[in-house]
Amino acid sequence: MSGITLPEFVDCVTVEFSAGRGGNGCASVRREKYKPLAGPDGGSGGHGGSIFLKADTSERTLISFRRKGHYSASNGAHGLSRLRNGARGKDLEVSVPCGTSVYDEGGRQIADLVSPGSCLQVVRGGTGGLGNAALAGYRRKTPRFALLGLPGQKRKLRLEVKSIADVALVGFPSVGKSSIISAISSAKPKIADYPFTTLHPNLGVVQSGPYRYTVADVPGLVEGASKGIGLGLNFLRHIERCSVVVHVIDCANTQQDPISGFNLIEKELSEYKVAENAIPLNKRPKVIVLNKIDVLQTKEEQDTLLYLQSVFKKLVTDVYAISAVTRSGLRQFTLRLGEICQEYPSQVQPTSQTILIPAKNTPEFSLDRTDGVYRVTGKKPEKWILQTDFSSDEAISYLAERLDRLGIEDALVRAGATCGDEVEIGGVIFTWDPSVANTSFSLSV
């Protein structure tokens, strides 16, 4: 194997995504012959580009995210005079393997991209600022200001790939799982006679009689796998979507008790936490396979095999003695797996084509007082602060009108605010002056 580099399998990464910023609006006045001030003609800024994750059958691993941990979409262009709106920022589409689960920083699952082509909008581009032509109205016929573009969303997300398979082969290292999947499908996993030869799941498609299903060869489990020992959590993750669990037991191994080994694996499966509505791993249909019967030569070894079959049949209905090398017993085994897969529903939930993260249903604003300063929080007022060009008195006046219409002035009165009190919104501090007509705030930077 010297000189050969095996592709790295990466199934869990944390990635930052930054959407594009919206372009600024333009404040300009149309000039015509004999009409030096013919009205506002500033265009609006373009929206920033958004970022989407798309499930792609050609992707098998998240290795590209390991090499690049931050993705950014392009910004929207600024508006121009003569009613020219800025171009929208280009959206960015990032491919991920089918079966990728997406989690926020708090560990909450946002989406499960299972179906090929399904998309998730992970961050939304910032809104472009309105030009003064769009702001013109009855009260302001020729506004001499425009709104600034908003920054795009930024998020840090955890991506996890969970294999999409109907059947999972589980067991201790070196029990022959890779040999079995190689014998019953066209998969070509690495096979060797030492532990942990398989370091990532191998998938194979099985066609047995009228049945067609997928099988995953899960890397060897050890005691404590459900707690992360021996990369156990990474391996158990790939069993979550399977309908059937196949316990592979090396019946020729005299160093380990097969029955206690089976119980230990069952314990690890029972302790692994699956999704809220999913069936626990140890409660799913299970099949026991006694592998490597081709090496059993003596009568004592044959008697041990019969004893194991009788014991396991008291625990599980389906028990098969097979040899991946001679292919003995594989036909009956694969047909039965097909029947079980058809009988039991898949744990994979199909996803819609495009998923948008819903906005949180929160009050328009809230008001509290800390250290003598009234603090206003809320999506709308904080967004308006970001849109305001504070070098323009007219823009500040427009902001004050919007805040007043939202009910912030009335809320300040009810809270006992008096003239001269400081009010903070989105990190900007104002001095409140309710006596000023149509503009309740004067800026105090």
Swiss-Prot record:
GO terms for biological process: ribosome biogenesis. Residues 357-434 form the OCT domain. InterPro entries: G_OBG (IPR031167), GTP-bd (IPR006073), GTP-bd_Obg/CgtA (IPR014100), GTP-bd_prot_GTP1/OBG_C_sf (IPR036346), GTP1-OBG_CS (IPR006074), GTP1_OBG_dom (IPR006169), GTP1_OBG_dom_sf (IPR036726), OBG_GTPase (IPR045086). Residues 165-342 form the OBG-type G domain. It is an enzyme of class 3 (hydrolase). GO terms for molecular function: GTP binding; GTPase activity; magnesium ion binding. SUPFAM superfamilies: Obg GTP-binding protein C-terminal domain (SSF102741), Obg GTP-binding protein N-terminal domain (SSF82051), P-loop containing nucleoside triphosphate hydrolases (SSF52540). GO terms for cellular component: cytoplasm. Its cofactor is Mg(2+). Residues 7-164 form the Obg domain. It is found in: Cytoplasm. Monomer. Belongs to the TRAFAC class OBG-HflX-like GTPase superfamily. OBG GTPase family. This is GTPase Obg. It comes from Tropheryma whipplei (strain Twist). The gene is obg.
